[in-house]
UniProtKB/Swiss-Prot annotation:
GO terms under biological process: inner mitochondrial membrane organization
Entry annotated with the keyword Transit peptide: yes
Keyword Mitochondrion annotated: yes
Keyword set, alphabetical order: Mitochondrion, Transit peptide
Intracellular or extracellular location(s): Mitochondrion
Name used for this protein in its record: Altered inheritance of mitochondria protein 24, mitochondrial
Family annotation (InterPro entries): AIM24, AIM24_sf
Designated gene of the protein: AIM24
A single Gene Ontology CC term: mitochondrial inner membrane
Primary site of residence: mitochondrion
Pfam families: AIM24
Assigned protein family: Belongs to the AIM24 family.
Length: 422
């Protein structure tokens, strides 16, 4: 705003009169906020629908927080001098450092966890990246990892975090589940999956002691055992759910969807898991299903040497082998029915337990290259009918009253002879 003043003297008689003229100019105030136009940051409220990641400055233990929907990224706030072990190829970012000089404080190394036992038990990953710093820092971990393979696996994975306080152990049955863990007193080990149930469970359920657990596979014969105190980040296929079983409560679950469960020691799986097969036909009575093998022929010959007793013994042996053959066929039929309806994949879990259930199982396939296309349309070699060149001769016939008629002929000689004969 500017102002100007102009004075004018007017003399009236002996009186002087002063007249003033004032001009005022008004300009519109700027509507924008004046500031540094070269700034590289903006206000937090200008960024919508994105979770703000804040680094932890004062921590005693690591903090795990799953992000996203599905939860495919894990944010970790790490205290100083506490190592973090993560699967190689899963690290997305390191942030929360005060200045560029603090990056030098982060130390990285490779740690191998029982590679021979993991190879024998069918557990894939044995190498983990170890990160440690003398100052607090934060990490972003992906649920997937970069690894060369001819088999294309599903990338629909999500995180679940577990805090171990030393009172409960965990058995992780999915071999690719352990993605990241930390804790100075946390123990990660491998054990073989039990094939049969314990005698204690067989007496409780009143079933034979040689009943299988349903968890054992020749290509996946081991599981990861977690004990002690620490933080663990597990990944599973699809969404992950928690199921709590009370005392003596039972649950049927597909073993391919069982991510892990709580146990009391590394040998407690045989006390809570048993294979379950759905009944597909009416079972026979126990008395008729048991086949007793007759005495040997040599024993009968020593006791009775008559032809009648020899015939009875031979007939008894024939009945025994015939019944054994029918029993084998019935067992094969039961196994075939169970395989067709998928019963062989179900196991029964007996509480009290905590279960982690993944909504989908691991699938893999060989990725085949797609054919090359030009401009989005596949070019195909299409051959049409071949056209041969030929000479065509035409002549015109003018007939009074009929007009002009055009005709074609391969040879003028035949046409001329025909016209002359007319």
């Amino acid at each position: 705003m500017s102002k100007s003043y102009v004075s004018r003297i007017v003399k009236v008689g002996n009186i002087k009169e002063l007249n003033f003229r004032r001009s005022v100019s008004i300009s519109q105030a700027p509507t924008g906020i004046q500031g540094d136009i070269s700034t590289t940051t903006t206000y937090e409220e200008n960024i919508k629908n994105a979770e703000n990641l804040k680094a932890g400055n004062v921590l005693e233990t690591a903090e795990f927080k799953a992000l996203g929907t599905p939860q495919s990224v894990l944010s970790i706030n790490c205290p100083p001098s506490v190592p973090v072990y993560l699967r190689r190829g899963s690290l997305l970012s390191i942030y929360g450092l005060n200045d560029s000089s603090s990056i030098k404080n982060v130390r990285s190394s490779i740690n191998f966890i029982n590679p021979i036992r993991r190879l024998l038990f069918g557990i894939n990953t044995s190498s983990y990246q170890r990160l440690e710093s003398t100052t607090p820092f934060s990490l972003l971990i992906s649920a997937t990892y970069r690894k060369f393979s001819i088999f294309k696996k599903s990338d629909n994975k999500s995180f679940v975090t577990i805090s171990l306080d030393g009172s409960t152990d965990w058995s992780i049955l999915y071999r690719d589940a352990l993605q990241v863990y930390t804790g100075n007193s946390l123990t990660v080990s491998q054990y073989r999956v039990p094939r049969t149930i314990s005698r204690k469970l067989s007496r409780t359920l009143n079933i034979p002691s040689n009943t299988t657990t349903g968890l054992f596979k020749w290509n996946k014969s081991g599981f990861i055992f977690l004990s002690g105190r620490g933080q663990v980040g597990l990944v599973g296929n699809g969404a992950i759910y928690n199921i709590n079983l009370d005392d003596k409560e039972e649950l049927l679950i597909n073993r391919d969807n069982l991510l892990g469960l709580t146990v009391n020691g590394p040998f407690d799986l045989q006390n809570c898991v048993v294979e379950h097969n759905f009944t597909t036909h009416e079972k026979r009575s126990e008395s008729s299903s048991v086949v007793q093998k007759p005495l040997g022929i040599s024993v009968i010959l020593k006791q009775q040497t008559t032809v009648r007793h020899k015939f009875k013994q031979i007939w008894s042996l024939f009945q025994y082998h015939l019944e054994a053959s029918f029993s084998f066929l019935r067992g094969s039929r039961n196994k075939t029915n169970n395989f067709l309806v998928g019963n062989q994949n179900f196991v029964k879990i007996i509480g009290p337990r905590n279960l982690l259930l993944q909504s989908s199982s691991e699938t893999s396939h060989i990725e085949t290259p797609t054919p090359k296309r030009k401009n989005g349309v596949e070019v195909a070699n299409v051959t049409g009918p071949k056209q041969t060149s030929a000479d065509y001769l035409s002549y015109v016939t003018v007939t009074p009253g009929q007009g002009v008629k055009f005709e074609s002929t391969p040879d003028f000689k035949d046409t001329v002879d025909k016209i002359e004969r007319k």
